[in-house]
A protein has these predicted regions:
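Structured mid-domain segments that build the active-site/substrate or prosthetic-cofactor binding neighborhood
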Residues: 1-66
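Acidic, low-complexity N-terminal propeptides/linkers enriched in Ser/Thr/Asp/Gly that mediate export
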Residues: 37-176
């Protein structure tokens, strides 16, 4: 194909959910279409959650243990009052920092912020990394005697997310 096509397209999660809903419907109505438009289910979250679940060791305690419990029963609906949605997004934010932060920090803080601001690229790359389990981004270059695995990075990201949420909202998870 001789023409340039930008890589800046939206994550397909929203259209995947809309298509899923439309394919399951018979006899459309205004109310049904409203429910499709107001649907807050994230196929991206549903796709990523099983990878997060696999990192639970059973040795977690406190809010970290509760976080895994919330994530295990979460249906991927991004309700404003959902503790699991908050934990998921805090985990994803920390995952991005833990995957890319060590390399991009070498260029300066502005580079990390600029890259993480490109949500479309970041989500697409995370999907690729999770599908293959491989990427040079996974290894933390600041730990020369250890090559991190994707599960280690995910586990660290969940733990970092809980620390971040406790610092922001306190240790009582019901206040999150």
């Amino acid at each position: 194909f001789p023409y340039y096509i930008s890589g800046f397209w939206a994550d397909p999660s929203r259209i995947e959910q809309i298509n899923r809903r439309l394919d399951s419907m018979d006899n459309m109505s205004v109310e049904k279409m409203k429910s499709v438009q107001l649907d807050q289910t994230s196929p991206f979250a549903q796709e990523i959650l099983p990878f997060i679940w696999l990192t639970e060791t059973g040795e977690e305690t406190g809010n970290l243990k509760r976080a895994y419990e919330f994530l295990k029963v979460w249906d991927g609906v991004e309700d404003v009052d959902s503790e699991a949605a908050l934990i998921f997004h805090a985990t994803m934010r920390n995952l991005v920092l833990n995957l890319y932060g060590d390399e991009l920090a070498l260029l300066g803080q502005n580079y990390l912020e600029a890259y993480t601001g490109l949500k479309y690229l970041v989500h697409r790359k995370i999907r690729e990394i999770f599908k293959t389990g491989e990427s040079s981004w996974i290894d933390n270059i600041t730990t020369p005697n250890h090559v991190e695995t994707l599960n280690e990075i995910i586990s660290k990201s969940v733990a970092d997310a809980i620390i971040e949420l406790e610092e922001s909202f306190g240790i009582n998870i019901s206040n999150w």
